[in-house]
A protein has these predicted regions:
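C-terminal helical subdomain
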Residues: 183, 199-236
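A glycine-rich helix->loop->beta "capping" turn
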Residues: 56, 77-88, 96
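Residue(s) in the substrate-gating loop at a strand-loop-helix junction
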Residues: 143
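The beta1-alpha1 cofactor-binding region of Rossmann-like NAD(H)/NADP(H)-dependent oxidoreductases
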Residues: 44-45, 63-73, 105
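Canonical Rossmann dinucleotide-binding motif of NAD(H)/NADP(H)-dependent dehydrogenases/reductases
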Residues: 5-36
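Substrate-binding pocket helix/loop in short-chain dehydrogenase/reductase
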Residues: 99-100, 104-112
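Active-site helix of classical SDR
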Residues: 123, 159
Length: 302
C-alpha cells in the first residue's frame, strides 16, 4: 500500500540563501504546495523581492549565516511573523574554486564559515523548539562533492563532506524525537554557482527546479539521503564496490577530474567576484576585515 504524502499546507519553512538559485526554486515549489516561506539572505533587498514573488504571507529577511546573533534574530522573526518553524533548509553556500595550494586563507575561511558553520548554527538553533513540539524537518544542502574529492575544489569538498557527516550524526541523535533530517546531494546545477563548469559525458546539468522538486518530495515522503538525480545513488553504490584505482580511472574517463579544475574562467568571473564579497566574521558595524576587504551586501549564493 502506497504511503500517503505529508501535507505541506500552512507549514512554516525558513530557507537560508533563499534569494537565488536552488533556494529560490525551492521556495517557489514549496509555496505551490501551500507552505509559508521565510527567505533569509545577506542581500535583504533581494530576499524581500523574492518573497514578494511567492504570494501573501511569505517574508524576506536579512541573514548572515556566519553570525549566530543574526541567525537567532532571523529565526525569532520567523516565529513572530509566521508561527512556529516546521522546516529549516540550510541552503546558503559558496564555491570559489582553484588549485588548493593557491587558495588564500581568507577564501578557505569564508567557505568553512558559510558552508559548514552556517549549517551547524542553523541546525543547532532549529533543534530545541522542534524537539519540544515533537515535529520538524531539517534539510541540509550538501553536494555530490560531499561523497568524493574533486580536483579544483578541495576545501569546498571538505565542507560538503562535513555537512553529510554532520547530518548523519544529528539524524541518529534525533531518532525518536519526531524531528526528521535530510541531506541533499545534487550534481552540478545550472545556477550562478555552477557557471562556467564543463559538462561531463552523459551527465546533463541539473536545473534548480530539479533539486527543488526532490526537496519537496523528501518533505512529503521523509527520507535522509536525497540524491539528485536519483540515479546517482545507484551509481555511487556501484562505484564504492570498485577498488580506488578503478573508481579514479572511471572518473578520469568521464572527465570528473576536470569539472572544477578546468572551468571557463571568463564565464565564472562574475560569480567568483561576488562570492569573494560574502565576507564572514565581521562584527556589526565593522567596515574592514583583517584582509582589508570591505564588507558588502552579498548573498551566500548557490
Amino acid at each position: 500500500m502506497a504511503k500517503e504524502p505529508r501535507s505541506l499546507q500552512g507549514k512554516v519553512v525558513a530557507i537560508t540563501g533563499g534569494a537565488r538559485g536552488i533556494g529560490k526554486a525551492t521556495a517557489k515549489a514549496l509555496a505551490r504546495e501551500g507552505a509559508v516561506i521565510a527567505i533569509g539572505d545577506l542581500d535583504a533587498e533581494l530576499a524581500r523581492a523574492t518573497a514578494s514573488e511567492l504570494g501573501e504571507g511569505s517574508v524576506g529577511l536579512e541573514l548572515d549565516v556566519t553570525r549566530r546573533d543574526s541567525f537567532e534574530n532571523f529565526l525569532d522573526q520567523v516565529s513572530e511573523r509566521l508561527g512556529p518553524l516546521d522546516v529549516i533548509i540550510n541552503n546558503a553556500g559558496i564555491m570559489p574554486i582553484g588549485p588548493f595550494a593557491e587558495e588564500d586563507d581568507a577564501t578557505a575561511k569564508r567557505m568553512i564559515d558559510i558552508n559548514l558553520h552556517g549549517v551547524i548554527t542553523g541546525t543547532k538553533l532549529a533543534i530545541p523548539p522542534m524537539v519540544q513540539r515533537r515535529t520538524g524537518h531539517i534539510v541540509n544542502i550538501a553536494s555530490q562533492a560531499g561523497k568524493a574529492g574533486v580536483p579544483g575544489g578541495a576545501t569546498y569538498c571538505a565542507t560538503k563532506h562535513a555537512v553529510v557527516g554532520l547530518s548523519e550524526a544529528v539524524r541518529a541523535e534525533l531518532r525518536g524525537t519526531g524531528v526528521e533530517v535530510s541531506v541533499v546531494m545534487p550534481a552540478v546545477v545550472n545556477t550562478e554557482l555552477g557557471s562556467g563548469l564543463p559538462d561531463t559525458p552523459g551527465v546533463k546539468k541539473l536545473e534548480p527546479e530539479d533539486v527543488a522538486n526532490e526537496i519537496v518530495n523528501a518533505l512529503k515522503f521523509p527520507k535522509f539521503d536525497v540524491w539528485v538525480p536519483r540515479s546517482s545513488a545507484a551509481i555511487s553504490t556501484v562505484m564504492q564496490l570498485l577498488p580506488r584505482r578503478g573508481r579514479e580511472a572511471i572518473g578520469r574517463l568521464l572527465n570528473v577530474d576536470k569539472v572544477l579544475a578546468e572551468p571557463d574562467k571568463g564565464a565564472r568571473a562574475a560569480y567568483e567576484e561576488r562570492a569573494a564579497r560574502s565576507e564572514p566574521g565581521l562584527e556589526p558595524g565593522e567596515g574592514e576585515s583583517g584582509s582589508g576587504k570591505k564588507r558588502t551586501k552579498s548573498a551566500a549564493p548557490r
